[in-house]
């Protein structure tokens, strides 16, 4: 591998060192981490120093592979992972992805208060009325 940190998209989401994963189970659920080492066919060593995920062994059933990868030597220490993560701009690439935006939107909707849900309902009614009016006019 080259020594450069390049974020690239792959056609196939392979389990590889440097692949960014989204943890879906456990105390770090919803956070990003990077694969540092492949232990066996069902477990990997992940580390997410920039996102608060401690270095740990993770079952591949408990993480989701993202399309993001960056150059990372096998078995890298946490400090190396942190440097490569920031130099590759992984957090920015993730924030710009539609997947991250969808998760943020889902969290925002779940956190709405009763009054905010009422406002959303009223806005949907107004939009529906405007569309119905435009269709009837055409």
Residue ranges and their predicted role:
Residues 32-34:
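Residues located in well-ordered beta-strands
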């Amino acid at each position: 591998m080259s020594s450069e940190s390049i974020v690239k998209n792959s056609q196939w989401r392979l389990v590889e060192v440097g692949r960014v994963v989204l943890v879906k189970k456990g105390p770090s659920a919803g956070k990003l981490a990077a694969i540092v080492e492949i232990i066996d066919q069902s477990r990997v060593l992940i580390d997410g120093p920039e996102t608060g995920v401690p270095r740990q062994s993770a079952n591949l059933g408990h993480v989701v592979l993202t399309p993001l990868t960056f150059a990372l030597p096998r078995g890298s220490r946490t400090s190396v992972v942190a440097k490569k993560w920031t130099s590759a701009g992984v957090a920015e690439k993730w924030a710009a992805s539609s997947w991250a935006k969808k998760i943020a939107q889902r969290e925002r909707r779940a956190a709405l208060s009763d009054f905010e849900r009422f406002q959303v309902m009223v806005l949907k009614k107004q939009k529906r009325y405007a569309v119905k009016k435009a269709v009837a006019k055409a």
